[in-house]
Amino acid sequence: MFAFFESLRGLTILSVCFRFLLATGCGAAIGYERSKNHHAAGLRTHIVVCIGAASVMLLNEYLLAYFNPIADPARLGAQVISGIGFLGAGTIVITGHQRGQQIKGLTTAAGLWASACMGLLVGSGFYEASIIMCCFLFGVIALLNQVDQKYLKTSAVVRVYIEYTAEAPFSVILTALRQEHWHVTHME
């Protein structure tokens, strides 16, 4: 199996096609799970990020091989890693107020960043690491999500955010909550 990968390490049309195909598959594996759970960055986004990162590493190899033997092959990859942070930041949403804040989208942002890193591995020709990373990343995102939903997200505490603009006194809402045996611990 490793001999197969060795034959694809150079810059040939076959190796370029294989790298983009592998980047598509790795990005799709992670993106599928995100799409299935209705997250902002899903299948297409993860594939595009992974292919884009792979293309940057291919460009690095090409520039190093054909134009400048003293070029820094990590420079463009470093820009991908820092630049993807801006895309990931756009998926993070903070809801609520100071005490009841919820942050959503961190796993999506981290998944995009990791997909970019996975694409850099693919683009550099480090196939074994990219396949192993894809398996671990999928396991963490998909399988641990089930553990999270089953064991960590179940709680007897419910946070409710209500914006009240009606003319009736707020005590009407509090009375209704108490009749349902809800305990209000904090109000602003």
Model-identified regions with their sequence ranges:
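Structural signal for the N-terminal portions of transmembrane helices
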Residues: 70-76, 95, 101-142
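Alpha-helical transmembrane segments and their membrane-interface boundaries
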Residues: 1-72, 76
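C-terminal ends of transmembrane helices
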Residues: 27-39, 87-100, 146
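Ligand-binding beta-strand-loop-alpha-helix segment within the catalytic cores
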Residues: 61, 77-89
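Canonical alpha-helical transmembrane segment with a positive-inside/aromatic-interface signature
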Residues: 100-101, 126-188
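Small-residue-rich segments of transmembrane alpha-helices in multi-pass membrane proteins
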Residues: 48-58, 82, 107-121, 164-167
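Juxtamembrane membrane-interface segments at transmembrane alpha-helix termini
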Residues: 57-64, 117-123, 142-151
